């Protein structure tokens, strides 16, 4: 499973947790972005596991992209954004899941989901046998978010992006791109389209989402249009990322 945790040890069989997640003085404010709680990332990749086993101390694990920009799914994406800002890139290949980890925390007997991600609500419920509740966004949370990924606009390409629902039939689409779920859209030039999954598989679509943002952004279209995916399983997290990318254009 790929998940970021506020005080939880989670596997497919059982869950144990400690509600005391306030950071100790040994943890620098820079690691928690000034927040009082510690979040623990649980990586799924064997290369990261190997690195952690070699070290005798914990490591901070910020995102490998600039704030508000498209998340990377390959070492090339990281280099594109962070070149000359970091000394090394540990290349473990392209991301298998594509979108970020799920972020969860606890309140009494409930599991709170702060950010939808590659571990689905269904998987968390099955593993923990505990009720799961989404943390709803608010204007205050957007100003001082509890965790990463909670601001209204995020993960966005530089090219203005719109939902397919915003398409006006009178619009000139000759220099516009389209990101679709599983089929070509006749309103757009076929060569201007990126299909996330030819067979309609949500996991494949998730793994391709950010790559589609990078590829289509590089083509310098006037506008990008994207369609919503089925609101189930990992599709919820994909739609969350689409919503935040579109919001940048609206603001």
Label every model-predicted segment.
Residues 1-251:
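Active-site-adjacent structural elements in enzyme catalytic cores
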């Amino acid at each position: 499973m790929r998940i970021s945790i506020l005080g939880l040890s989670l596997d497919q069989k059982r869950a144990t947790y400690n509600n005391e997640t306030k950071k100790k003085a040994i943890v620098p404010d820079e690691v928690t972005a000034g927040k009082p709680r510690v979040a623990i990332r649980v990586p799924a990749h064997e290369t990261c596991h190997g690195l952690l086993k070699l070290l005798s101390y914990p490591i901070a694990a910020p995102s490998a992209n600039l704030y508000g920009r498209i998340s990377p799914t390959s070492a090339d994406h990281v280099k594109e954004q962070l070149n000359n800002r970091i000394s090394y890139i540990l290349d473990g290949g392209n991301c298998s899941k594509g979108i970020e980890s799920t972020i969860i925390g606890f309140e009494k007997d409930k599991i709170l989901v702060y950010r939808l991600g590659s571990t689905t609500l269904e998987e968390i419920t099955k593993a923990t046998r505990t009720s799961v509740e989404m943390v709803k966004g608010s204007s205050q949370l957007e100003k001082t978010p509890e965790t990463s990924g909670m601001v209204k606009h995020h993960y966005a390409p530089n090219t203005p992006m719109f939902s397919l629902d915003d398409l006006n039939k009178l619009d000139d689409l000759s220099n516009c791109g389209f990101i679709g779920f599983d089929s070509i859209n006749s309103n757009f030039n076929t060569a201007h389209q990126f299909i996330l999954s030819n067979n309609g598989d949500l996991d494949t679509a998730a793994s391709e989402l950010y790559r589609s943002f990078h590829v289509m952004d590089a083509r310098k279209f006037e506008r990008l249009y994207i369609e919503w995916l089925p609101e189930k399983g990992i599709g919820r997290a994909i739609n969350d990322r689409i919503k935040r990318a579109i919001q940048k254009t609206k603001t």
